[in-house]
Design a protein with these regions (language model features):
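Outer-membrane beta-barrel proteins and related beta-barrel translocases across Gram-negative bacteria
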Residues: 1-371
């Protein structure tokens, strides 16, 4: 159970989200599942009960109740097969898999137009989202749905080392009912029978090197709406360098350039040892369309015997002509806790493949376990 108090600050909400006002929200979610699996199959039914209660809602737009509740069940079924065969490719013994997977979800309709929306938004479509019942992030909106996601994956695994050196995945979601739940209070529901098509591939023929690519094909516009391609070098833990190019296309977004979702960006990030137990961290995210650096980050991590020190500075553009600079400094006392503001979330979101530096491994002497 989670209880949260929302208050409007100077910059807490804007636009329609600010019309939700102030108030309290209490959540309670419980679920039960029964996983079944064999050597080449799995079958997992799941039922979730979700209850949300709002009270003491003030300063909200007309039509939002001062007190309201929502309760509903969420049904899902996740199932798949794994087929395997052995082959020889490029002179190496390889195990190839073919993995079809289906995810079905059903959520009945509940009218939510009289409820506030503090933190829900439309989740970005990706492969993880295809296996999620609710298309909205946050807790204030739960979409009605009767949907089926179909995903097909193939992997090539080195028979000698067990390492995966190639994979490709394609997937799409199909809808069997119209959407009725909207994010806000004057947005009509949408009618469609399928989502965009997602495809992704990874290739790591050489040790430590990985090529990655992904596309999203719009079934509405009949063209590619999102592209991501990049290369990453990750020879060992806490050592990674990545370079990516990202392109988004949305002809329906007519907002001025800085605010719309059409992007052309290059993203460079790294985590790399400078000297023993000292690691450098950085990110440089540049927009070709706006001709500005939209996000940059620099930091250091140092680990001693029983403590770890992390520091970082992040600067990002939050609106046209305005930027925000964040400073992070955290001291982690191994086994006791942390002091200061942690940069781990910013580093994890900004640096591809980032892993927080852990404590030094304990050196075991020859007589440490002698009895």
């Amino acid at each position: 159970m989670t209880a949260t108090r929302f208050r409007r600050g100077i910059s807490s909400y804007n636009g329609q989200r600010g019309e939700s006002g102030d108030g309290n929200r209490t959540l309670w979610n419980t679920s039960i599942s029964y996983p079944l699996m064999g050597s080449y199959w799995f079958f997992t039914p799941k039922v979730t009960y979700s209850f949300t209660h709002y009270n003491d809602i003030k300063h909200a737009k007309a039509g939002i109740d001062s007190s309201s509740s929502r309760s509903l069940p969420i049904y899902s079924l996740d199932t798949g097969l794994i087929f395997e065969r052995n082959s020889t490719i490029f002179g190496r013994e390889t195990e190839q898999t073919l993995e079809p997977r289906l995810f079905y979800a059903y959520i009945p309709y509940r009218n939510q137009r009289h409820m506030p929306n503090f933190d829900s938004s439309l989740a970005d479509l990706n492969f993880a989202e295809l296996f999620t019942p609710n298309k909205y992030s946050g807790y204030d909106r739960i979409a009605n749905t009767n949907q089926l996601s179909a995903v097909l994956t193939t992997r090539y695994i080195d028979s000698g080392t067990g390492k995966e050196w190639f994979s490709a995945t394609v997937g799409q979601r199909y809808y069997f009912t119209d959407e009725k739940v909207d994010l806000y209070w004057d947005t009509p529901g949408k009618t469609k029978n399928r989502s965009d098509v997602l495809a992704a591939t990874q290739f790591s023929l050489f040790e430590g090197w990985r090529l990655e690519g992904a596309i999203q094909y719009s079934t509405e516009w009949s063209k590619i709406s999102k592209t991501s391609a990049g290369i990453r070098y990750n020879p060992r833990d806490f050592s990674t360098v990545a370079l990516y190019y990202r392109y988004n296309y949305n002809p329906n977004d007519k907002r001025e350039d800085f605010y719309n979702t059409n992007i052309k960006q290059v993203d460079f990030s790294f985590q790399w040892p400078i000297m023993k137990d000292l690691y450098g961290l950085g990110r440089y995210n540049y927009s070709f369309r706006d001709k500005i650096v939209v996000d940059s980050l620099m930091g250091l991590e140092y680990r001693a015997g029983c403590w770890i020190l992390r520091g970082a500075v992040q600067r990002y553009i939050r609106s046209e002509g305005r930027s925000t600079t964040n400073f992070f400094l955290e001291l982690e006392l191994v086994g006791l806790g942390t002091v200061g503001s942690s940069p781990i979330q910013a580093l994890s979101e900004g640096i591809t493949g980032y892993k927080p530096v852990g404590p030094k491994p304990v050196e075991v002497g020859r007589y440490d376990y002698y009895e």
